[in-house]
Amino acid sequence: ILKGIMDCMEQGPLTGSYARDVRVIVYDGKMHPVDSNELSFMLAARHAFSDAFKQAGPKILEPIYDLEVYVPADYMGDVMSDLQGRRALIMGMDSEAGYQKLSAKIPLKELANYSISLSSLTGGRASFTTKFASYELVPSDIQSKLIADHEAELEKDAE
């Protein structure tokens, strides 16, 4: 039973990503001398876990990073627009050593290719640092898309 549940958690019923912070309680079970074996218990556990997990109304979490961007004042508007398009939450701005320091929180997924984008926007005159901050809920519209994409991928693999 445990192996079936752990396998299901590793593959994640919603998007194929690891399911964390899950508590499972088995209330009842019977063993039949002919039909019971390790595989049947594992498959039953996987099926039960998947059904219960989806009924529990799970939410998808994404890693959020603290981002600090050091940018010349001339490029501040372009950099802020780019960050807002990446779902960043601007936390503040300061002036530091002739540069503007922009502080934000941003989903890790949105940092893909950020270095290239920032260099392109500023002619290579800006830099940034990141640090893991927390896990936050994915917005519901993005969660729905992630689930739909995963289901489509499963259907494609089944063909």
Describe each PLM feature range.
Residues 1-159:
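Accessory interaction regions appended to the cores of large information-processing enzymes
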